[in-house]
Design a protein with these regions (language model features):
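A short glycine-rich, His/Asp/Glu-containing loop-to-beta-strand
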Residues: 2-32
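Short beta-strand segments in beta-sandwich/barrel cores
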Residues: 21, 30-31, 48-53, 67
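Short, surface-exposed secondary-structure edge patches
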Residues: 22, 42, 57-60
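Short histidine-centered beta-strand/loop micro-motifs
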Residues: 23, 31-36, 54, 79-80
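Glycine- and acidic-residue-biased ligand/ion/polar-headgroup-sensing regions
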Residues: 38-50, 55
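A cytosolic small-molecule/anion-sensing beta-strand core signal
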Residues: 46-47, 63, 82
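Short acidic-glycine-tyrosine-enriched beta hairpin
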Residues: 56-73
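Ligand-binding loop in jelly-roll beta-barrel domains
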Residues: 72-94
Length: 94
């Protein structure tokens, strides 16, 4: 089989180059501030709406068809404004 359809949640890919995390957040649910040193982050909402906070200084509203890219050194926290499905791609910087 050449492809794999990913439907589970949590860390769905984790190798030396990339980690992919699939999350489901209920409305009002939050992810506390944290960072990912050594990674470039691509954060995308598949369904729903969230606010992403970087270093507690910048706020990014995200909905489907939008991708937020940022350096993993920044501290990220998240709040789900609606029930949301999210994919986060953490790429090792070289």
């Amino acid at each position: 089989m050449l492809g794999k359809i990913i439907t589970e949640h949590g860390q769905v890919v984790n190798n030396k180059d990339i980690m992919v995390v699939h999350l489901h957040l209920k409305e009002g649910e939050t992810i506390p501030a944290h960072n990912h040193p050594g990674r470039q982050i691509f954060f995308t909402v598949v369904e729903g709406e969230v606010e992403v906070y970087l270093d507690e200084k910048e706020t990014y509203p995200l909905v489907p068809k939008k991708v937020l890219e940022f350096d993993g050194e920044a501290r990220i926290s998240v709040k789900a404004l609606k029930e949301s499905d999210i994919f986060v791609y953490l790429v090792v910087k070289r």
